[in-house]
């Protein structure tokens, strides 16, 4: 997961060194449909059973983001996206996949440190749409709200946007958790989008 995130960051930096992009005027508003890959995994405090490995769940991320340019170096963005999150347990002769699907609402501040290159952070509210272990509905076992901090980088060229983010969950995912059994649903996402000026 960390290697994939690092590769995305290096790709963005490489594009920055070899391409130019037009600065947007103050007060410009853009709308950006986006789609990409999400890598969900389990973090937090818990005791892993002996012989059981934790793995990531790879899924789809798709949505739209509106962005308002306050000036040449700062903008504020509000988005909505569907994200397939979760994790897998492999061991003891069985494999169990926990599928958590969220409707996420990210609110970010974007700092343009170079032409087209933005660093971003903020807060994201995730609303649980469904939760399954294999084909069994387990939504009642998980919290309906997931609050996280998105930390990301993006690069724009000819209105196309490559965006890489790590969403660090602040709230526990599982209900009835104990002090040594608090699960968090984190997400790494890499998306490609296109900006339309309105």
Residue ranges and their predicted role:
Residues 74-76, 117-119, 159-164:
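Repeated loop/turn-to-beta-strand initiation elements of outer-membrane beta-barrel proteins
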Residues 27-31, 54-60, 99-103, 143-149, ...:
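Residues that define the transmembrane beta-barrel architecture of outer-membrane proteins
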Residues 26, 71, 114, 157-160, ...:
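Outer-membrane beta-barrel channels and translocator barrels
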Residues 33-39, 80-82, 121-127, 155, ...:
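Transmembrane beta-barrel strands of outer-membrane/channel proteins
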Residues 43-50, 88-95, 131-138, 174-179:
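Outer-membrane beta-barrel translocator domains and adjoining extracellular loop/strand segments
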Residues 20-67, 167-169, 195:
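Short glycine/proline- and aromatic-enriched beta-strand/turn motifs that initiate or cap beta-hairpins
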Residues 85-88, 138-198:
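Predominantly the C-terminal beta-signal and adjacent terminal strand-loop region
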Residues 62-64, 105-107, 119, 151-153, ...:
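Membrane-embedded beta-strands of outer-membrane beta-barrel proteins
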């Amino acid at each position: 997961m960390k290697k994939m995130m690092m590769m995305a960051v290096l790709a963005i930096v490489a594009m920055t060194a070899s391409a130019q992009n037009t600065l947007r005027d103050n007060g410009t508003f853009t709308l950006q449909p986006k789609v990409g890959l999400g890598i969900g995994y389990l973090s937090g405090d818990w005791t892993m059973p002996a012989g059981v490995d934790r793995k990531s769940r790879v899924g789809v991320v798709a949505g739209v983001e509106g962005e308002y340019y306050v000036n040449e170096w700062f903008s504020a963005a509000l988005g909505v996206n569907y994200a397939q999150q979760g994790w897998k347990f492999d061991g003891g002769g069985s494999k169990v996949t926990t599928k958590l699907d969220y409707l996420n609402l990210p609110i970010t501040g974007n700092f343009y440190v170079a032409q087209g290159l933005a660093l971003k952070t903020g807060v994201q509210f995730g609303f649980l749409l469904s939760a399954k272990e294999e084909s069994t509905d387990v939504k009642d076992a998980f919290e309906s709200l997931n609050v996280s901090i998105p930390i990301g980088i993006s690069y724009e060229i000819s209105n196309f946007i490559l965006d890489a983010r790590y969403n660090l969950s602040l709230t526990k995912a599982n209900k009835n958790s104990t002090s040594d059994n608090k699960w968090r649903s984190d997400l790494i996402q890499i998306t490609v989008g296109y900006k339309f000026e309105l």
